[in-house]
């Protein structure tokens, strides 16, 4: 189909991956966006796209400008996507596309993961081009894996010393061929060649936030469930050992809240004039963290006493011998104990099926890296983004939403 030529009264956003931790935050912040100047407009319409059924998701998004369209499988190709979206009100007015969809199934090998994710970005872009002739900007979110974080876990090194800068080279072989983000960016470069729209890459570390469904990339709820169920079994005040390593316990890193991430991506999308298409930008809350600082704070939110990992030193491990931090204290300790998890759900009147439903990927990715990975924010500052967020407060905010949804007690 050929998109109709229109002049939308104000920007319209299309969000692929709308019910993920980033996508939900994007939709919420797009709806909250206020026009404080000609270059920061209010979005007249926000169209969220997801694959899974959207009923009973507890989105907490009530705005007549918002529509969530489910049943969109990007792996089925652009024609399938167009068929689902073509009747959506305002789809022909889409000006800004936010691509935060991702397939990260544990069953996929590196080659499969790359193939699937490249196919998804192809479908998303080609469908948007067919549906709207007003497309101006596409924002694609990747991650700091482009700097070699995964490579460092497999014996490789980072592409540059911390603070990590966007101009760093790609990781060398064989890790380069295993990185899905490089393939995604190469495909977007190809798809955008000769087009009137531009695209930009956003690179966060771990994202803190609420999402209304189970998702393998949501570290926030996995950490909350880990600590909540641990407190249920071991009691208030029990010491809980950090399930990482002595090296990762002291490494410096940066996280980002879903609101901070969304605000930056919206700022970038609406301040893209004069930028080179394909540019990459780091984003974080702006504070520098270590697990030795964050773990005790997180544990305290659930009535526990956070202590260091085995071998971290006498000070970090103080109190473990008093009981409660020995034995099955790694990230996987709740898995397989269905009886205890069901009892936890019943006694706390939370949604069924969440107890013990933790993400191995999230724990490994956030608690196992042994290299400093602070992100340089110089490029973000150069385009006028000076906002900061507090990481501990971001966890508090997200966990409050999970409690409201009766996922956490």
Swiss-Prot record:
It comes from the Eukaryota. NADP(+) binds at residues 49, 68, 195, 288, 290, 299. CDD domains: 5beta-POR_like_SDR_a. Its EC number is 1.-.-.-. Pfam families: PRISE. Residues 306-332 are annotated as: Disordered. Pathway: Mycotoxin biosynthesis. It is an enzyme of class 1 (oxidoreductase). The keyword NADP applies. InterPro entries: NAD(P)-bd_dom_sf (IPR036291), PRISE-like_Rossmann-fold (IPR055222). Keywords: NADP, Oxidoreductase, Virulence. GO terms for molecular function: oxidoreductase activity. Short chain dehydrogenase; part of the gene cluster that mediates the biosynthesis of sirodesmin PL, an epipolythiodioxopiperazine (ETP) characterized by a disulfide bridged cyclic dipeptide and that acts as a phytotoxin which is involved in the blackleg didease of canola. SirD catalyzes the O-prenylation of L-tyrosine (L-Tyr) in the presence of dimethylallyl diphosphate (DMAPP) to yield 4-O-dimethylallyl-L-Tyr, and therefore represents probably the first pathway-specific enzyme in the biosynthesis of sirodesmin PL. Belongs to the short-chain dehydrogenases/reductases (SDR) family. Highly divergent. This is Short chain dehydrogenase sirS. It comes from Leptosphaeria maculans. The gene is sirS.
